[in-house]
């Protein structure tokens, strides 16, 4: 190889190295303590877990818990509002420190770590009164059109259930994905879909808010799952610190009180072995 070609080759390699993506694996707890704040990715369209009040303030069950946990760590909270579909990618990229209200799934556990659970979740089906749907039975949903939030556990659950229907020679449920729960409910009210599948506790809030709409809860679908906060896998110290703060809030009764306030009931939550196999 002559000198000119060598120079061109070396320069090309140098430019290639500069343009390669850089993956940062720093422990987020160090930055949280240094900056005096924890950056939280949140989609505040999921009442009663997280939503905005009439003044635009982010409120709900998880924001109250996050504020208390952050105070226990001696830091403030900075929210970064984004669509739910962008939250886990932001967490993995390291542009945020944590996110609340994630269904705990084996697939997500491969990509992120979980703080100990803050709640439990069971999905349900909601429809308009007077429609042909009477129950949440999968066979009854076969062939119907259902709205779900994109990239959520309910969407993944329904995709898995569609495989079951197909294996039995039955029609799949046609799934239409939306960014927010409000969009799924609007699609239902406008009769663009036959039903909506999402967390049961969210539907109680939705029915209360939309008293003018003839919404009816058809029943539960799928099993119970824990809900937890997510943290980047490169930050085990932050995960441990947040878990420690939640354990304090469980021990002094604060977590149970917040569950009663926002859900109207309490649930017993595991602290170990809570990721489904």
Predicted regions: what they are:
Residues 67-75, 154-177, 207-211:
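Ligand-binding cleft/hinge of the Venus flytrap
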